[in-house]
Amino acid sequence: MDWVPWIFGLGDVRWLGWASEYPVSLVLWLLCFVGHLGIWCVVFNRVHATALPRKFRKQSEKVIVPIVVLPFCYMVVGMCLWFDTTFDSNYIVFKIYMFLAVVSSFYFVGRWVNRRFIVGLPAAVVSSERVWLDIRERVHEEVSGDFFEGAVPQLLGVVPFNEASKLTLQKVTLAFDIPEQLEGFKICQLSDLHLTGHICIEYFQEIVKEANQFEPDMVVITGDLIDEAICLSWLESTIGQLKAKYGVFYVLGNHDKRISDEAMLRGKIEACGLVAVSGAWHEVDVEGVKIVITGNELPWYRAVDQLPPPDQQPESDFAILLSHSPDQLEWARDYKLSLIHI
């Protein structure tokens, strides 16, 4: 079978008896779906990685989600009900897109295989362990109301195999060429807590307890802390209870922009004892060893523009960046930072 001409005629293949007669066709259709999903996941992620107005981003979701879902539903229903389901592929644009989707699938699958099985962990990673804790089971006796608040969260909470109440703990041991005073230095990173009010406050209090049991030397929070102003009153009894020998540091992320009064938000966070590091160098002395911490909140907040150029970076034995966006990796390389928390 000549693949390229076949792909350009892909939409003319009918489902009736198709899977058994055309196994290669089935594989190519699946590749087409993988590529289609990958393309629109990239679009979705890039839109949400920008500082575009939230209204525009929410409207874009109403376009992207149907584009992703409807072709799957159309073809799956056709298979299940043995409909004579055919895409009209007389349009050259449709044919070209299907061809690009198949080609893209090789790229996405290749990237996944390379990252998962070939490249492996970075050289600095000595070990990495991951465990999942079901917080709902831990706090069920302490929760005065419902664990999930609101009809939709409650409905989603009963869906089998959902992980809405689970906490992922990942313990990573890193090896650096560092002064002996930093041997065994423990950093606890919290990210994407998303205080929305949809999950009870006890859930987040239990996360803080778990973090404190780790007895970290330093705690860093890397964005998307709070979505709804109604949860501002939760800050003191949640993140305000974090304990670390050398301090608790934070940067904001895209979801924190939902709190329109930025100065008020930062004021309440810092009133809980957290230290803002975006656009500044914060120095920490660890038994005579100098650690500097900075933060980059681009593209959502501009404080990083206040930093001096890389050649004026303060001297240190170890430099740490906090960011909510992996797009700042090149920026971090310019500043020759030792460790990046995203």
Q: Model-found features: residue ranges?
A:
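Conserved small/polar residues in nucleotide/adenosyl-binding loops
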Residues: 340-342
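A structural signal for the hydrophobic beta-strands that form the central parallel beta-sheet
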Residues: 189, 221-222, 295
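Non-catalytic terminal accessory segments
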Residues: 1-167
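Core catalytic region of metal-dependent phosphoesterases/phosphodiesterases
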Residues: 53-58, 89-98, 196-285
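Short, flexible loop segments at the rims of nucleotide/cofactor-binding pockets, characterized by
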Residues: 194-199, 225-228, 296-301, 318-319
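Beta-strand-turn-beta hairpins that frame and shape the catalytic cleft
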Residues: 167, 176-188, 282-293
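Conserved acidic residues
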Residues: 217, 246, 317-319, 338
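Binuclear metal-dependent hydrolase catalytic cores centered on His/Asp/Glu-rich metal-binding motifs
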Residues: 267, 271-273, 287-323, 329-330, ...
